[in-house]
Structure formats: structure tokens, C-alpha cells
A protein has these predicted regions:
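Juxtamembrane boundary at the C-terminal end of a transmembrane helix
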Residues: 128-133
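Interfacial helix-start motif at the membrane-water boundary
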Residues: 42-61
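Transmembrane helix-loop-helix
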Residues: 67-122
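Seven-transmembrane alpha-helical bundle of G-protein-coupled receptors
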Residues: 12, 58-61, 84-91
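Cytosolic, membrane-interface loops and tails of multi-pass inner-membrane proteins
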Residues: 25-47
């Protein structure tokens, strides 16, 4: 796996680690739940279960490319490549699903979730494309 693909996979993992931090560690801060997620403070108790679980989902998802890169550099290149590809593919599909939920305006005004969907999908797609060469 070339260096560009590895760097892009690491970026994809970092995006998901950032999401974990926002959703689990910092979610109760108004700048996060109101500023990033557009959730009013009054709705915080109703959304805390969601943010906690989705945050850990993102943490576990970030572990895929990280573990894949570790395997790649510790004598298990084939397993590492496949784990990076699978994890990035999963992230790409999750980003597409997030984009669809934005188009359908499932929880916020249409278009307000576009940035999150792109942040989730683009680095993983770029890593997959780079890994093909």
C-alpha cells in the first residue's frame, strides 16, 4: 500500500476520532451540541444516549485503519491492506448514508449535515482510490 493511501487512511481515522471526542467527551458543551450538531440544550437529555453510542461506533471504526496500518508495518502487510480497505469502505458507505439522511432532512434542515457526510466519506474514498495504485 502506497504512502498516499496510508496517509489518507490515517486522516479518515482521525476524522472518526474527532467525531468520538465531540460525541462522547465534549457533547455536553453548548459549542458542541448546539454549534456542531445543532441540538438545543433543552434536548440534550434526549440525545445523550445517541451521541454516546454513535461516538463509540466512530471510535471503533477509527480503530480499523489504525490497526491495519500497524499490521502493514509489523510484518502482516496483506492483513493490514485488507483491514484498511474494509474500514475505509465502511467509512465511505457510512458517509453516503449520512449524506442521504441529510438530503431527506431526517433531523435537521436539508444541507446542514453535508459537511459531516463529506468529512466522513471523502478521506476514505481518497484512501481507497490511492490504494488501487
Amino acid at each position: 500500500m502506497n504512502v498516499v493511501a496510508q496517509v489518507l487512511a490515517a486522516v479518515a481515522a482521525l476524522v472518526h476520532l474527532l467525531a468520538f471526542t465531540w460525541e462522547v467527551v465534549l457533547f455536553e458543551r453548548p459549542g458542541v451540541h448546539e454549534g456542531i450538531f445543532k441540538i438545543p440544550t433543552a434536548n440534550l437529555p434526549a440525545t445523550r444516549l445517541w451521541s454516546f453510542n454513535v461516538g463509540f461506533y466512530n471510535l471503533f471504526l477509527a480503530a480499523g485503519p489504525v490497526l491495519g496500518l500497524v499490521l502493514l508495518h509489523t510484518g502482516h502487510p496483506e492483513a493490514g491492506r485488507w483491514l484498511v480497505r474494509y474500514s475505509c469502505g465502511f467509512m465511505l458507505l457510512a458517509g453516503i448514508a449520512l449524506g442521504v439522511s441529510d438530503v431527506l432532512a431526517l433531523s435537521r434542515p436539508r444541507g446542514s449535515g453535508r459537511g459531516g457526510a463529506l468529512a466522513q466519506a471523502v478521506p476514505s474514498l481518497a484512501a481507497l482510490v490511492a490504494a488501487a495504485f
